[in-house]
Amino acid sequence: MSMVPQLTLVPDTVFNYLSKKLTLLIAGLILFGCTASNDDNYPTVSYIAETEPVVTNDDAADDPAIWINLDNTANSLIFGTDKKSGIYVYDLKGNILSYQNLGSINNVDLRVIDDELHLVSSNRSDSTLDYWIFPTEGIYQYFENNPDNAFSEELKHYHLEAGMDIYGICMGIINGAPVAALTEEEGVRVQYWDLTQLKIINTFDITADEDNVPLLGNEAEGCVFDDENKYIHVSREGARGFLKTYNAENQQLVKVIDSRDGNVGGDPEGVAIYKVDATTGYIILSSQGDSKFNIYDREYPFTYIDSFRVDNVSDTDGIEVTSASLGDYAPNGILVVQDGYNQPDNQNFKIVSMEEVFKKKE
């Protein structure tokens, strides 16, 4: 069985453009001796669409995931969690196709394996890793035709007990096998799951490299697998606010990329990978405390490049990004970000064209 992550490469012209921009930006940082910046003049981009608000009041919307329909990109899907009630499925314009009350679903992630969509979520109601498998053929119509019961017990699925209070989750395919990282609420543990064997194969401590660790506020939530480069990037919250990178094969720390002493304002939250080709591109991080989004080089040593804001978006938790071309709608892919306020309505997710981000960096 072929287990290959869904990867859409950007065109050569875009690759050359982005590579040139990356070189110029890094050169600029070196030339001007840029380190931590208090400059508030970050470029601001507008969003091109937004999802309908979630049903729950207050802090509820949290984490998105994107599935790209390679046969018809207009019929791609955005999954979004209401961490107090369940999972939404939206079209690319933010319209609700399906919503199901599944409990306190905090984070969600997915991969495509053969012709199936594998979706994982962190269920805080039951302290379980919930693992759903959907056939990709006709999946858009499936969610459209099942507006309130798409996550059916008749589907192939698993509810895996974590044995701890859980928080965030991310999924990857490492050495051909589906895996997941599951983080602990108000704790320092990250579980590494083998999703073929449906079991935990390692647990590591996100504070193991630190001295004088505070007693509270050390949990991680946001994380992302870089399947091709075999990394896990984890955003560690609390007073120190680290973005850390681990080896996805042995879960050993590779590097502390950034912190509150650098370019992170408040808690680092959602983290995502924008792929230019199989191994190059960008890491994007939600710097929640100052409502900006940091850009880093995807390759080691993960150099900080710059930051930007999204118009009228603040206090962002989860994010997801894809480089897949969505035609005239978003030729260089989209970034989906949770909006922590969205006043006067309940929280929702904003959809940003990555073309606008790159234009602002010119």
Task: Say what each PLM segment does.
Residues F32-G33:
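C-terminal motif of bacterial Sec signal peptides marking the signal peptidase cleavage site
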Residues S37-E362:
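Sequence/structural signature of beta-propeller domains
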Residues T8-V10, L25, D40:
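Short linear sequence motifs
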Residues K20-A27:
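Sec-dependent signal peptide recognition
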Residues T13, A27-G28:
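Enrichment for repetitive, rod-forming helical segments
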Residues M1-L18:
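N-terminal secretory signal peptides that target proteins for export/translocation
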